[in-house]
Amino acid sequence: LFNNAGIGSGAGLLNSSLDEWQRQWDVNLMSHVHAVRAVLPGMLERGEGYLLHTASMAGVLSSHGNLPYAVSKHAVVGLAEWLAFTYAHLGIRVSLLAPLAVRTPMLGDAADGEWANQAGGPIKEPVEVAQQVLNAITTERFLILTDSIAQTWMERKTADPDRWLHGMSRLQQRLEGVDDAGLPEN
């Protein structure tokens, strides 16, 4: 089963409605839950199966500017981890795809603009990501990262979470056009 659903709005905490939160939660997480509940009994009966979930680097490390998306993708990470350790001994394999940025309709025109520079690397083509996924599931690797910078970021976050959060705060200020003192940049 390949669970690959995701929508986003670019909203934060105070500028997103509860309806928008629910819509993203339903698509980004609950679609995975419903699909797994539909196929898992048959997989368990056969004693084998493979579940591939698409989250996002926003679900592994969080992201700027799209809080409902990041939170719902964090939940997908939790779901995939739980499924992996709960059902491994019963023949169920699980992988989690956490791409940074893939050229899909979800990115729209942003894939060619400033967002691409902020993403930390080039936008991946879908065929390139598909090959990475095939290579990873062949070896039954759980976490599939599509960009080498993502591994570096994860290592930095886990090595020193406080430093990571401080760096993310500074990046947020730059994205908002303010300096480290909170003053508008000229």
List the predicted regions and their residue ranges.
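Substrate-binding pocket helix/loop in short-chain dehydrogenase/reductase
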Residues: 12-13, 20-25
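Active-site helix of classical SDR
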Residues: 36, 72
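Conserved NAD(P)H cofactor-binding loop of Rossmann-fold oxidoreductase domains
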Residues: 4-9
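A short helix-coil junction within the Rossmann-fold of NAD(P)-dependent oxidoreductases
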Residues: 11, 38-47
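Residue(s) in the substrate-gating loop at a strand-loop-helix junction
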Residues: 56
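SDR active-site lid
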Residues: 85-152
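Active-site loop immediately N-terminal to the catalytic Tyr-X3-Lys motif
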Residues: 14, 63-67
